[in-house]
Amino acid sequence: MGPAEAGRRGAASPVPPPLVRVAPSLFLGSARAAGAEEQLARAGVTLCVNVSRQQPGPRAPGVAELRVPVFDDPAEDLLAHLEPTCAAMEAAVRAGGACLVYCKNGRSRSAAVCTAYLMRHRGLSLAKAFQMVKSARPVAEPNPGFWSQLQKYEEALQAQSCLQGEPPALGLGPEA
C-alpha cells in the first residue's frame, strides 16, 4: 500500500493510539506519546528516541531523550543515524528499560527507526521487521527515501554477518 492509500485509510479509521508495543521493550508512537507520562511509566520506557527536528522531548521524569534531527523528507540522511541510534536503544533495553521511538505522526521516521532496530538487534530481514512494525501500527509507512536507506542498511547488515564484530560501513553519505 502506498502513502496515498495509507492516508485515505487513516482518514477513515480512528486515530491510532499515541504508542503501541512493537516488540518486548520497543514502542512506536506519535509526538503525543512523549507527553503521556502514565503510559510511559506503565510501559517501563527509559529512553525516548525523538526522530524529528521540531517535536518536543519527553516530559516524564527519569526518561532520557535521544534526538535524531531529521525531517520527513526522502532526501534526509537517516542512514547515518541508524547505527548509533540502534546502539543507544539496545543499551537502554539491556539495562532493563524500554524505548519509545516517535516522530510527529508515528508514521514514517519513527517506523523506519523501529524497523532498523529490529533488523540490527533482532536479526530480522527488512521485510519481517517492517511487517512487525506495520502489524503493531498499521499507519506505518516510511517515505520512499527512508525505505531505500533501510534497504541499504539491510545490505550492510548482511555483509557484516560475514565479518564478526565489524560494524557496518555506514554514514558515508547516500552512496553508502
Swiss-Prot record:
Q: Which InterPro entries match?
A: Dual-sp_phosphatase_cat-dom, Dual_spec_Phospatases, Prot-tyrosine_phosphatase-like, Tyr_Pase_dom, TYR_PHOSPHATASE_DUAL_dom
The enzyme class is hydrolase
UniProt keyword terms in alphabetical order: Hydrolase, Protein phosphatase
- Give the intrachain disulfide bonds: none
Q: Which PROSITE patterns match?
A: TYR_PHOSPHATASE_2 (PS50056), TYR_PHOSPHATASE_DUAL (PS50054)
Per the UniProt entry, the effect of residue 103 to S is:
Loss of catalytic activity
Q: Indicate the impact reported for residue 105 to A.
A: Increases activity with phosphotyrosine
Q: Which residues form the active site?
A: 103 (phosphocysteine intermediate)
Is Hydrolase given among the entry's keywords?
Answer: yes
Gene3D superfamilies from the UniProt entry: Protein tyrosine phosphatase superfamily (3.90.190.10)
Q: Name one Pfam family in it.
A: DSPc
Q: Would the keyword Nucleotide-binding be found if you checked this record's keyword annotation?
A: no
- Give the reactions, separated by semicolons, that this protein catalyses: O-phospho-L-tyrosyl-[protein] + H2O = L-tyrosyl-[protein] + phosphate; O-phospho-L-seryl-[protein] + H2O = L-seryl-[protein] + phosphate; O-phospho-L-threonyl-[protein] + H2O = L-threonyl-[protein] + phosphate
Where in the numbering of this chain does the Tyrosine-protein phosphatase domain appear?
17-159
Q: What is its EC number?
A: 3.1.3.16, 3.1.3.48
What does the record say mutating residue 102 to H does? Decreases the already low catalytic activity
> Which GO-annotated molecular functions does the record name?
phosphatase activity; protein serine/threonine phosphatase activity; protein tyrosine phosphatase activity
Protein's GO biological process: dephosphorylation
Known partners and oligomeric status: Monomer.
Function recorded in the entry:
Has phosphatase activity with the synthetic substrate 6,8-difluoro-4-methylumbelliferyl phosphate (in vitro). Has almost no detectable activity with phosphotyrosine, even less activity with phosphothreonine and displays complete lack of activity with phosphoserine. The poor activity with phosphotyrosine may be due to steric hindrance by bulky amino acid sidechains that obstruct access to the active site.
Which family does the record claim for this protein? Belongs to the protein-tyrosine phosphatase family. Non-receptor class dual specificity subfamily.
Quote the protein name from its UniProt record: Dual specificity phosphatase 28
* Native source organism of the sequence: Homo sapiens
Instruction: Give the source lineage, highest ranks first.
Output: Eukaryota, Metazoa, Chordata, Craniata, Vertebrata
The gene behind this protein is: DUSP28
